[in-house]
Amino acid sequence: MKIDILTLFPDMFTGVFGSSILKKAQEKEAVELRVVNFREYTTSKHNSVDDYPYGGGAGMVLTPQPIFDAVEELTKETDRKPRIVLMCPQGERFTQKKAEELAGEEHVIFVCGHYEGYDERIREHLVTDEISIGDYVLTGGELASMVVTDSVVRLLPGVLGNQTSQVEDSFSTGLLEHPHYTRPADFRGMKVPDVLMSGNHKNIDEWRHKESLRRTYTRRPDLLEERELSKQEEKWLEQIKEDR
């Protein structure tokens, strides 16, 4: 997979892309990550990439020319059109399902904005997707693109050492992940649930499933509205409600 990031601040990505899972994914050649400063593509004699908005108003607006030219340069040798993703607070809310969708692409280009916003022609005639990571405002799209890139890359084949871990992560099953415990079994009087040390894998799996359901119900009940519960899950959910 190939991922390109269009940004005015390429140095922001050095530490993130050179560490942890993203570093390992590149070493395994599961993904090629490129960070491109789209200022290098401007034709402005002042080397600018933004201008005042027509009609007046506060702030500066990113001009279309350098972003269009950068995308055209990055895609000139490919037959298949890539997904071009605009990072912005007006976009579709990013979810695990969206991460899985993007992970199936051969080439994704993230466009990171800054200043007041983008010229609308970038939205209308260039990008294929607009993504937001939450209902809050960031200085630019860089941090958001890092979040999405990390979420997508870890889904690529061979990137994670334990594929089971990936499947059991929060949101992958539509539920939040169950609690985890490790040694010691008794820490300052706080004990690990007996079932986890019983060796009975059927009971352990059942406990984890039920606790995932409990955690989802108490912390993110909205997720249950989108999920078709099994009969067993419905039974557990009734017990969970009675326990509260």
UniProtKB/Swiss-Prot annotation:
Q: State one molecular function term (GO).
A: tRNA (guanine(37)-N1)-methyltransferase activity
- Which Gene3D superfamilies does UniProt cross-reference here? 3.40.1280.10, tRNA(m1g37)methyltransferase, domain 2 (1.10.1270.20)
| Keyword set, alphabetical order | Cytoplasm, Methyltransferase, S-adenosyl-L-methionine, Transferase, tRNA processing
Q: What is its EC number?
A: 2.1.1.228
Q: Name the Pfam families for this protein.
A: tRNA_m1G_MT
Catalytic activity reported: guanosine(37) in tRNA + S-adenosyl-L-methionine = N(1)-methylguanosine(37) in tRNA + S-adenosyl-L-homocysteine + H(+)
What InterPro entries does the record tag this protein with?
Answer: Alpha/beta_knot_MTases (IPR029028), tRNA_m1G_MeTrfase_C_sf (IPR023148), tRNA_m1G_MeTrfase_TrmD (IPR002649), tRNA_m1G_MTases_N (IPR029026), tRNA_MeTrfase_TRMD/TRM10 (IPR016009)
List localization entries: Cytoplasm
What are the GO BP annotations of this UniProt entry?
tRNA N1-guanine methylation
The keyword Cytoplasm belongs to this UniProt entry's keyword annotation: yes
- Residues where S-adenosyl-L-methionine binds: G113, I133, G134, D135, Y136, V137, L138
Quick one: a GO cellular component term?
A: cytosol
Q: Report the main location listed first in the record.
A: cytoplasm
- Lineage: superkingdom: Bacteria
User: PANTHER family from the entry?
Assistant: TRNA (GUANINE-N(1)-)-METHYLTRANSFERASE
User: How does this polypeptide assemble, per the annotation?
Assistant: Homodimer.
Q: Note the NCBIfam families from the entry.
A: PRK00026.1, trmD
Q: Give the family per the record.
A: Belongs to the RNA methyltransferase TrmD family.
Q: What does this protein do?
A: Specifically methylates guanosine-37 in various tRNAs.
Q: Spell out the protein name for this chain.
A: tRNA (guanine-N(1)-)-methyltransferase
Q: Which organism is it from?
A: Bacillus mycoides (strain KBAB4)
